Amino acid sequence: RILNDMLMEAKTDVVVNYDTDVIFPPSSYLIAYDKITKLGYDLVYPYGQGEWQYKVTVNQDLINDLVNSDWSHSAFEDHDAKEKSTSDYGWAQFFNRKSYIEGGGENENFVSYGYEDNERPERFERLGYKVGRVDDTIYHMEHVRTMNSWFTNPHIENNKNLYERLKEMSPEQLKNYYDTVEYMRKRHGSK
């Protein structure tokens, strides 16, 4: 809900849904922004799909290197405690703000962790929005998972069922769902 609150309050043409535990090369931010403002994309992932993720173990050496490098992302590039992994969806998305709102924003019926990151790009593609990527690295700072930030959360089955139901909808049904879902009606002043 808070993400949608911020989306509605934003005044910029480009907005970013950004997890605080990731960092990208500076060029990725600029390319993602340009893809929206100059090339007409509606949704851009600022990292590649496939083997583009580095899982980074945060330790005192990394913190020291980060501070001593004037906060340069090169501290992550040079950090030994990282391993290559896959990347698909989640972490950060750049949006054309208007398209994000028209496409339903963040689905508030997903609760806690799970399946919202899978549903979002599928929805935007199926609704005809232009979705793209920046083929570059993502550094994900590994962290402890609580019950609510993993597949162990008590809402995971409901989230999965919602995702499966939305996947089965035609583009017209999906558009109708997002046009009439309660949280969007409230935001647009309808009951």
Model-based region annotation:
Residues 1-9:
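Glycine-rich, basic loop-to-helix element that forms the pyrophosphate-binding segment
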Residues 12, 40-41, 129:
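Short, high-confidence coil segments that cap the C-terminus of an alpha-helix
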Residues 13-23:
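Short beta-strand-to-loop acidic/aromatic patch adjacent to the donor-nucleotide binding site
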Residues 7, 25-108:
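Conserved catalytic core of nucleotide-sugar-dependent glycosyltransferases
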Residues 87, 109-191:
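C-terminal catalytic/acceptor-binding lobe
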Residues 21-23, 49-52, 100, 137-139, ...:
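Short, solvent-exposed loop/turn segments at secondary-structure junctions
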Residues 20, 91, 116-117:
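Short, conserved alpha-helical segments within structured domains
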Residues 5, 31-32, 119-123:
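Alpha-helical elements of Rossmann-like donor-binding domains used by nucleotide-donor carbohydrate transfer enzymes
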